[in-house]
Amino acid sequence: MTDLSRRQWLASLPVVAGAGGLLTGTVQTAEVSAQPVNLAPFGYCFNTSTIQGQKQPITKVVEIAAKAGYQGIEPWVRELDAHARSGGSLKDLGKQIADQGLSVEDAIGFFEWAVDDEATRRKGLEEAKRNMDMVLQIGGRRIAAPPFGTTDRSDLDLKRLTERYRTLLDIGQSIGVIPQLEVWGFSKTLGQLSEVALVAIGSGHPQACILPDVYHLHKGGSPFEGLQLLSGAAFHVFHVNDYPANPGRESITDAHRVYPGDGVAPLDSIFQTLRANGFRGMLSLELFNREYWKQDPLEVARTGLEKMKTAVQKSLG
Protein backbone atom coordinates (compact mmCIF):
# COMPACT_ATOMS: atom_id res chain seq x y z
CA MET A 1 0.00 0.00 0.00
CA THR A 2 1.46 3.38 -0.99
CA ASP A 3 1.74 6.26 1.51
CA LEU A 4 -1.02 8.11 -0.34
CA SER A 5 -3.44 5.19 -0.47
CA ARG A 6 -2.71 4.39 3.19
CA ARG A 7 -3.57 7.95 4.21
CA GLN A 8 -6.75 7.80 2.16
CA TRP A 9 -7.71 4.49 3.78
CA LEU A 10 -7.08 5.83 7.29
CA ALA A 11 -9.06 8.97 6.56
CA SER A 12 -12.01 6.84 5.56
CA LEU A 13 -12.25 5.30 9.07
CA PRO A 14 -13.58 8.09 11.32
CA VAL A 15 -16.20 5.95 13.11
CA VAL A 16 -16.84 2.44 14.32
CA ALA A 17 -20.07 0.56 13.74
CA GLY A 18 -23.17 1.96 15.40
CA ALA A 19 -26.55 3.44 14.65
CA GLY A 20 -25.68 6.00 12.00
CA GLY A 21 -21.97 5.80 13.01
CA LEU A 22 -22.53 7.37 16.42
CA LEU A 23 -19.29 6.30 18.13
CA THR A 24 -15.89 7.75 17.33
CA GLY A 25 -13.11 5.54 16.11
CA THR A 26 -9.76 5.18 17.82
CA VAL A 27 -7.42 5.29 14.83
CA GLN A 28 -4.82 8.01 15.45
CA THR A 29 -1.73 8.49 13.29
CA ALA A 30 0.81 11.23 12.83
CA GLU A 31 0.15 11.10 9.11
CA VAL A 32 -3.54 11.91 9.56
CA SER A 33 -2.95 14.67 12.11
CA ALA A 34 -0.35 16.23 9.84
CA GLN A 35 -2.91 16.91 7.13
CA PRO A 36 -3.93 20.55 6.53
CA VAL A 37 -6.57 21.72 9.00
CA ASN A 38 -9.69 23.58 7.94
CA LEU A 39 -10.22 26.36 10.47
CA ALA A 40 -13.82 26.94 9.42
CA PRO A 41 -15.33 23.49 8.93
CA PHE A 42 -18.84 24.34 10.12
CA GLY A 43 -21.86 25.98 8.58
CA TYR A 44 -23.86 28.67 10.38
CA CYS A 45 -27.60 28.48 10.96
CA PHE A 46 -30.18 30.76 12.58
CA ASN A 47 -32.76 29.37 14.98
CA THR A 48 -35.69 31.77 14.83
CA SER A 49 -36.20 31.69 18.62
CA THR A 50 -33.32 34.16 18.80
CA ILE A 51 -35.65 36.98 17.66
CA GLN A 52 -38.90 35.36 18.72
CA GLY A 53 -39.84 38.22 21.01
CA GLN A 54 -39.93 40.72 18.14
CA LYS A 55 -42.89 38.77 16.70
CA GLN A 56 -41.83 39.03 13.06
CA PRO A 57 -43.66 36.96 10.42
CA ILE A 58 -41.60 34.05 9.16
CA THR A 59 -41.17 35.71 5.75
CA LYS A 60 -39.48 38.66 7.46
CA VAL A 61 -37.37 36.37 9.64
CA VAL A 62 -36.09 34.65 6.49
CA GLU A 63 -35.02 38.04 5.09
CA ILE A 64 -33.28 38.89 8.36
CA ALA A 65 -31.37 35.60 8.47
CA ALA A 66 -30.22 36.04 4.88
CA LYS A 67 -29.19 39.69 5.35
CA ALA A 68 -27.27 38.78 8.49
CA GLY A 69 -25.20 36.28 6.50
CA TYR A 70 -26.39 32.88 7.70
CA GLN A 71 -26.33 29.82 5.47
CA GLY A 72 -29.23 27.99 7.07
CA ILE A 73 -32.40 28.64 9.01
CA GLU A 74 -34.17 26.65 11.73
CA PRO A 75 -37.81 27.76 11.98
CA TRP A 76 -40.43 26.69 14.48
CA VAL A 77 -43.48 24.75 13.30
CA ARG A 78 -45.78 27.23 15.02
CA GLU A 79 -44.37 29.91 12.69
CA LEU A 80 -45.23 27.71 9.73
CA ASP A 81 -48.72 27.21 11.15
CA ALA A 82 -49.16 30.97 11.54
CA HIS A 83 -47.98 31.51 7.97
CA ALA A 84 -50.47 28.96 6.64
CA ARG A 85 -53.32 30.37 8.75
CA SER A 86 -52.70 33.82 7.30
CA GLY A 87 -53.12 32.43 3.79
CA GLY A 88 -49.46 31.91 2.99
CA SER A 89 -48.19 29.01 0.92
CA LEU A 90 -45.57 26.79 2.50
CA LYS A 91 -44.15 25.91 -0.91
CA ASP A 92 -43.81 29.61 -1.73
CA LEU A 93 -42.10 30.11 1.62
CA GLY A 94 -39.70 27.33 0.73
CA LYS A 95 -38.95 29.06 -2.57
CA GLN A 96 -38.31 32.33 -0.74
CA ILE A 97 -35.91 30.58 1.61
CA ALA A 98 -34.02 28.99 -1.28
CA ASP A 99 -34.00 32.22 -3.29
CA GLN A 100 -32.42 33.98 -0.30
CA GLY A 101 -29.60 31.44 -0.38
CA LEU A 102 -30.67 29.63 2.78
CA SER A 103 -31.24 25.97 3.54
CA VAL A 104 -33.78 24.63 6.04
CA GLU A 105 -31.48 22.66 8.30
CA ASP A 106 -33.99 21.71 10.98
CA ALA A 107 -37.33 22.76 12.45
CA ILE A 108 -38.63 22.89 16.00
CA GLY A 109 -41.88 21.08 16.67
CA PHE A 110 -43.51 19.38 19.64
CA PHE A 111 -45.23 16.01 19.53
CA GLU A 112 -45.62 13.28 22.14
CA TRP A 113 -43.75 10.40 20.48
CA ALA A 114 -42.19 9.01 23.67
CA VAL A 115 -45.07 8.82 26.18
CA ASP A 116 -46.30 5.56 27.70
CA ASP A 117 -50.00 6.09 27.04
CA GLU A 118 -50.66 4.43 23.69
CA ALA A 119 -53.56 6.66 22.64
CA THR A 120 -51.59 9.81 23.44
CA ARG A 121 -48.54 8.46 21.65
CA ARG A 122 -50.62 7.61 18.58
CA LYS A 123 -51.89 11.21 18.47
CA GLY A 124 -48.34 12.41 18.95
CA LEU A 125 -47.13 10.42 15.96
CA GLU A 126 -49.92 11.87 13.84
CA GLU A 127 -48.80 15.34 14.90
CA ALA A 128 -45.23 14.36 14.03
CA LYS A 129 -46.37 13.39 10.54
CA ARG A 130 -48.15 16.73 10.15
CA ASN A 131 -45.06 18.61 11.31
CA MET A 132 -42.79 16.64 9.01
CA ASP A 133 -45.03 17.27 6.03
CA MET A 134 -44.89 21.02 6.66
CA VAL A 135 -41.12 20.92 6.99
CA LEU A 136 -40.87 18.96 3.75
CA GLN A 137 -42.98 21.56 1.94
CA ILE A 138 -40.49 24.32 2.76
CA GLY A 139 -37.54 22.18 1.68
CA GLY A 140 -36.52 20.94 5.11
CA ARG A 141 -34.84 17.63 5.81
CA ARG A 142 -34.91 17.35 9.60
CA ILE A 143 -37.02 18.08 12.66
CA ALA A 144 -36.20 18.15 16.36
CA ALA A 145 -37.52 15.29 18.47
CA PRO A 146 -37.26 16.34 22.13
CA PRO A 147 -38.78 14.30 24.99
CA PHE A 148 -41.96 16.36 24.84
CA GLY A 149 -44.65 15.09 27.20
CA THR A 150 -42.23 13.11 29.36
CA THR A 151 -40.21 15.85 31.05
CA ASP A 152 -41.64 15.08 34.51
CA ARG A 153 -41.07 11.31 34.25
CA SER A 154 -37.90 9.76 35.60
CA ASP A 155 -39.09 6.16 35.40
CA LEU A 156 -39.43 5.61 31.65
CA ASP A 157 -37.78 2.48 30.30
CA LEU A 158 -34.99 3.56 27.96
CA LYS A 159 -35.31 0.30 26.03
CA ARG A 160 -38.90 1.19 25.21
CA LEU A 161 -37.77 4.66 24.20
CA THR A 162 -35.34 3.13 21.70
CA GLU A 163 -38.26 1.26 20.13
CA ARG A 164 -40.39 4.40 20.06
CA TYR A 165 -37.60 6.45 18.54
CA ARG A 166 -37.13 3.80 15.86
CA THR A 167 -40.85 4.01 15.07
CA LEU A 168 -40.51 7.78 14.74
CA LEU A 169 -37.46 7.33 12.51
CA ASP A 170 -39.38 4.92 10.28
CA ILE A 171 -42.15 7.51 9.92
CA GLY A 172 -39.61 10.19 9.10
CA GLN A 173 -37.90 7.98 6.55
CA SER A 174 -41.19 7.36 4.77
CA ILE A 175 -41.84 11.11 4.58
CA GLY A 176 -38.30 12.29 3.94
CA VAL A 177 -37.66 14.21 7.17
CA ILE A 178 -35.26 12.90 9.83
CA PRO A 179 -36.25 13.32 13.50
CA GLN A 180 -33.20 14.38 15.51
CA LEU A 181 -33.23 13.14 19.10
CA GLU A 182 -32.84 16.30 21.16
CA VAL A 183 -31.26 16.65 24.59
CA TRP A 184 -33.44 18.67 26.98
CA GLY A 185 -31.38 19.39 30.07
CA PHE A 186 -34.33 20.29 32.28
CA SER A 187 -36.15 17.03 31.51
CA LYS A 188 -36.14 14.00 33.80
CA THR A 189 -36.22 11.87 30.65
CA LEU A 190 -33.50 12.24 28.00
CA GLY A 191 -32.04 15.16 29.93
CA GLN A 192 -28.48 13.93 29.56
CA LEU A 193 -26.34 13.23 26.52
CA SER A 194 -25.60 9.71 27.75
CA GLU A 195 -29.30 8.80 27.80
CA VAL A 196 -29.91 10.28 24.38
CA ALA A 197 -26.90 8.45 22.95
CA LEU A 198 -28.15 5.17 24.42
CA VAL A 199 -31.57 5.60 22.81
CA ALA A 200 -30.14 6.70 19.46
CA ILE A 201 -27.64 3.83 19.30
CA GLY A 202 -30.14 1.33 20.65
CA SER A 203 -32.64 2.19 17.93
CA GLY A 204 -30.37 0.49 15.42
CA HIS A 205 -31.71 2.79 12.73
CA PRO A 206 -29.36 4.10 10.01
CA GLN A 207 -30.82 7.61 10.29
CA ALA A 208 -30.59 7.86 14.08
CA CYS A 209 -28.95 11.12 15.13
CA ILE A 210 -28.64 13.51 18.06
CA LEU A 211 -29.41 17.22 18.39
CA PRO A 212 -27.20 18.62 21.19
CA ASP A 213 -27.33 22.09 22.71
CA VAL A 214 -24.60 23.83 24.71
CA TYR A 215 -27.10 25.18 27.25
CA HIS A 216 -28.98 21.90 27.62
CA LEU A 217 -25.79 19.89 28.14
CA HIS A 218 -24.92 22.28 30.97
CA LYS A 219 -28.43 22.36 32.42
CA GLY A 220 -28.71 18.58 32.51
CA GLY A 221 -25.25 18.05 33.97
CA SER A 222 -23.84 16.24 30.95
CA PRO A 223 -20.03 16.29 30.99
CA PHE A 224 -18.91 18.09 27.84
CA GLU A 225 -16.08 15.55 27.62
CA GLY A 226 -18.74 13.02 26.61
CA LEU A 227 -18.82 14.61 23.17
CA GLN A 228 -15.38 13.10 22.57
CA LEU A 229 -16.96 9.63 22.45
CA LEU A 230 -19.42 10.49 19.70
CA SER A 231 -18.63 10.73 16.01
CA GLY A 232 -19.40 13.96 14.24
CA ALA A 233 -21.65 11.83 12.04
CA ALA A 234 -24.02 11.57 15.01
CA PHE A 235 -24.93 15.25 14.60
CA HIS A 236 -26.30 17.25 11.70
CA VAL A 237 -27.09 20.39 13.70
CA PHE A 238 -25.62 21.60 16.99
CA HIS A 239 -27.40 24.34 18.96
CA VAL A 240 -24.89 26.98 19.99
CA ASN A 241 -25.22 29.53 22.77
CA ASP A 242 -23.46 30.45 25.99
CA TYR A 243 -24.47 30.86 29.62
CA PRO A 244 -23.31 33.01 32.56
CA ALA A 245 -21.63 31.71 35.73
CA ASN A 246 -24.70 32.75 37.70
CA PRO A 247 -27.38 31.60 38.30
CA GLY A 248 -26.19 28.06 38.91
CA ARG A 249 -27.14 25.01 36.91
CA GLU A 250 -30.15 24.13 39.07
CA SER A 251 -31.88 27.49 38.64
CA ILE A 252 -30.62 28.67 35.24
CA THR A 253 -33.28 28.92 32.52
CA ASP A 254 -33.44 29.31 28.75
CA ALA A 255 -33.82 33.07 29.23
CA HIS A 256 -30.28 33.26 30.65
CA ARG A 257 -28.70 32.14 27.38
CA VAL A 258 -26.27 34.70 25.96
CA TYR A 259 -24.26 35.17 22.78
CA PRO A 260 -21.42 32.70 22.21
CA GLY A 261 -18.31 33.99 23.95
CA ASP A 262 -20.21 36.15 26.42
CA GLY A 263 -20.49 33.42 29.05
CA VAL A 264 -18.50 30.64 30.67
CA ALA A 265 -19.35 27.62 28.48
CA PRO A 266 -16.25 25.66 27.37
CA LEU A 267 -16.78 26.58 23.73
CA ASP A 268 -13.10 26.16 22.86
CA SER A 269 -13.06 22.49 23.78
CA ILE A 270 -16.53 21.89 22.31
CA PHE A 271 -15.59 23.22 18.87
CA GLN A 272 -12.21 21.49 18.96
CA THR A 273 -13.91 18.19 19.78
CA LEU A 274 -16.50 18.63 17.05
CA ARG A 275 -13.84 19.30 14.44
CA ALA A 276 -11.66 16.41 15.61
CA ASN A 277 -14.61 14.01 15.54
CA GLY A 278 -15.54 14.92 11.99
CA PHE A 279 -18.59 17.12 12.53
CA ARG A 280 -19.15 19.23 9.42
CA GLY A 281 -22.75 20.23 9.96
CA MET A 282 -24.44 23.42 11.07
CA LEU A 283 -23.89 25.39 14.25
CA SER A 284 -27.31 26.90 14.91
CA LEU A 285 -27.63 29.95 17.13
CA GLU A 286 -30.52 29.34 19.54
CA LEU A 287 -31.22 32.01 22.17
CA PHE A 288 -34.20 33.06 24.27
CA ASN A 289 -32.74 36.18 25.87
CA ARG A 290 -35.46 38.68 26.73
CA GLU A 291 -33.05 41.62 26.47
CA TYR A 292 -32.15 40.64 22.92
CA TRP A 293 -35.86 40.40 22.12
CA LYS A 294 -36.14 44.14 22.85
CA GLN A 295 -33.49 45.02 20.27
CA ASP A 296 -33.46 45.40 16.51
CA PRO A 297 -33.84 41.85 15.15
CA LEU A 298 -31.36 42.28 12.30
CA GLU A 299 -28.75 43.63 14.68
CA VAL A 300 -29.30 40.70 17.04
CA ALA A 301 -28.95 38.23 14.17
CA ARG A 302 -25.77 39.88 12.90
CA THR A 303 -24.24 40.11 16.36
CA GLY A 304 -25.02 36.47 17.02
CA LEU A 305 -23.36 35.31 13.81
CA GLU A 306 -20.31 37.49 14.38
CA LYS A 307 -19.87 36.21 17.93
CA MET A 308 -20.42 32.61 16.88
CA LYS A 309 -17.77 32.86 14.15
CA THR A 310 -15.39 34.65 16.51
CA ALA A 311 -15.79 31.89 19.10
CA VAL A 312 -15.09 29.22 16.47
CA GLN A 313 -12.03 31.05 15.14
CA LYS A 314 -10.71 31.55 18.67
CA SER A 315 -11.01 27.86 19.44
CA LEU A 316 -9.69 26.50 16.17
CA GLY A 317 -7.19 29.17 15.21
Q: Language-model segments: which ranges?
A:
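Flexible, glycine- and charge-enriched loops at secondary-structure boundaries
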Residues: I58, H83-S86, L90, R121, ...
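Active-site acidic/histidine proton-transfer and metal-coordination neighborhood
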Residues: L13-L23, S33-N38, K60-A66, Q96-S103, ...
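A short acidic, helix-capping loop that chelates divalent metal ions and anchors anionic groups
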Residues: E79-D81, E112-D117, T151-D155, G220, ...
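Histidine-acidic metal/acid-base catalytic patches
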Residues: T2-A68, L190-P212, H216-G317
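Glycine-rich, proline-tolerant flexible connector loops at the mouths of alpha/beta enzymes
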Residues: E74-G94, F148, D152
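Catalytic-core regions built around general acid/base machinery
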Residues: S89-D99, R164, L168, G226, ...
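Active-site-proximal loop/turn and secondary-structure-junction residues that shape catalytic pockets
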Residues: T50-Q52, V77-E79, F110-F111, P147-T151, ...
